[in-house]
């Protein structure tokens, strides 16, 4: 894989929980880049994707079908996704060689919804480093609905930190689909990300409210 100046294009891995909007971001990024006349290479590494709305230069579904993995190994969707990730990682060099000859300014990679594949599986770490070739970073997408509670927001902070720690790549957190949130909710979430004291207070309040709810239920 080489860009127009002969160097390896930087690689941007899009990571996040299922439904956070990874494929939507890749689609929008590709359209935005084309508008600016930037040559972006979109890569799909999700073998379980039913459809994508971007134009992938490489699609892992051409190598591995999640439904075939489920049938062959008698696995459910989650187990098949994990095994499929291991199978893709075992072919990481072959995948890299297939996209190596593509010229572009940047490569953006759509990843499976199971964020634990990046947080806890060595296979995904191997795949990321082979494809990244030392010129990679991560975008971790925060789900807007999960982010609307202090505990949900912190849970995603922890997941992002684990992925960053495991892969050792520069990581940026972004709140996805923020247009779905009410303005006051969006403002509150952004404040949590900027002021840990405010976030801590919100966590204590949430915990106290939950304790009161549980206690009330027990008395009933």
Model-predicted regions and their roles:
Residues 116-219:
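Conserved catalytic-core segment of NTP-binding enzymes
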């Amino acid at each position: 894989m080489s860009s127009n100046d002969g160097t390896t294009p930087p690689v941007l891995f899009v990571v996040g929980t299922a439904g956070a909007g990874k494929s939507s971001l890749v689609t929008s990024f590709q359209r935005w880049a084309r508008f600016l006349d930037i040559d972006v290479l979109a890569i799909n590494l999700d073998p379980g994707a039913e459809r994508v709305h971007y134009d992938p230069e490489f699609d892992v579904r051409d190598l591995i079908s999640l439904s075939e993995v489920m049938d062959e190994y008698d696995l459910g969707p989650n187990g098949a996704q994990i095994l499929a990730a291991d199978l893709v990682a075992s072919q990481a060099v072959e995948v890299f060689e297939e996209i190596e000859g593509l010229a572009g300014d940047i490569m953006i990679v759509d990843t499976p919804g199971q964020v634990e594949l990046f947080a806890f599986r060595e296979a995904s770490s191997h795949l990321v480093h082979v494809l990244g070739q030392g010129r990679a970073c991560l975008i971790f997408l925060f789900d807007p609905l999960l982010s609307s509670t202090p505990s949900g927001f912190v849970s995603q902070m922890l997941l992002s930190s684990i992925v960053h720690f495991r892969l050792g790549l520069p990581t940026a957190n972004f709140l996805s689909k923020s247009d779905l949130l009410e303005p006051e909710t969006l403002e509150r979430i952004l404040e949590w990300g900027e002021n840990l004291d405010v976030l801590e207070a919100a966590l204590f309040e949430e915990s106290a409210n939950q304790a009161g709810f549980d206690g009330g239920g027990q008395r009933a």
